[in-house]
From Swiss-Prot:
Name this protein carries in UniProt: U4-ctenitoxin-Pr1a
Highest taxon of source: Eukaryota
Major localization class: secreted
Entry note about domains: The presence of a 'disulfide through disulfide knot' structurally defines this protein as a knottin.
Organism name: Phoneutria reidyi (Brazilian Amazonian armed spider)
UniProt KW Disulfide bond keyword: yes
Tissue specificity note: Expressed by the venom gland.
Lineage: Eukaryota, Metazoa, Ecdysozoa, Arthropoda, Chelicerata
Family affiliation: Belongs to the neurotoxin 10 (Hwtx-1) family. 53 (PNTx27C4) subfamily.
Disulfide bonds: C3-C17, C10-C22, C16-C34
Length: 36
């Protein structure tokens, strides 16, 4: 699974580099931003 650094676009099949899931201001909307 690819990881996205904080602040970059994060897709359903990606996770943040810290091992957390993608977070965004909109729920269930992709792509979203990796905030954590």
């Amino acid at each position: 699974i690819a990881c996205a650094p904080r602040g970059l676009l994060c897709f359903r099949d990606k996770e943040c580099c810290k091992g957390l899931t993608c977070k965004g201001r909109f729920v269930n909307t992709w792509p979203t931003f990796c905030l954590v």
